[in-house]
Amino acid sequence: MAERPDFIRHWRELEGPDDGAYPGDTELMSIGAPLGRLLGLTRLGIHHERLLPGRRTSYPHAESSEDEFVFVLEGTPDAWIDGTLHRLTPGDGVAFPFGTGICHTFLNNTPQEVRLLVVGERNKPENRIHYPLNLEYLKTRPDAWPDVPTRTLGDHNGMPRVEIDAPTDPE
């Protein structure tokens, strides 16, 4: 069998360290493998994200100029969308069109690990971002989105919690 080219790799070979946190915050987020960038893509961002129990992928946010798509590979995360939780299962996909102001993050409120495939456009210089629940952090961002479309937020605070009594997978 021929030697595999550099653009064929397993996500485990490309995963970064478990140290993803926002500046000034100690909360660990998901553990990512930037597949697109490390495999040579220049216009498309593709990330494999592992979400350990009690973690979230990011602060809730919306983007002005970049589409984003999240596909559940494994586990049952909650999609936090505009302050409301939506339980997902493997095979579910969620799309966030740019410019809509739909704020989102993904929470692992279960005792099992979650794996996600996150696809979007590579960082665009014109993109602006909004963090509706992290306004102090937003003030530090030179790319803050000042005229984000107004959307009603539900009551959920965007923080994960692990369901202690949730059923566990015996395998």
Provide a role label for each language-model segment:
Residues 1-43, 130-131, 135-171:
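A short, N-terminal "cap"/entry segment at the start of jelly-roll beta-barrel domains
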Residues 48-52, 62-80, 119-121:
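Short, conserved beta-strand element in jelly-roll/cupin
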Residues 29-34, 47-63, 101:
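Conserved short histidine dyad/triad with adjacent acidic residue
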Residues 75, 91, 106:
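Short hydrophobic/aromatic patches on the structural cores and recognition surfaces of FHA
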Residues 41-46, 64-67, 72-74, 89, ...:
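Short connector loops at helix/strand junctions that flank enzyme active sites
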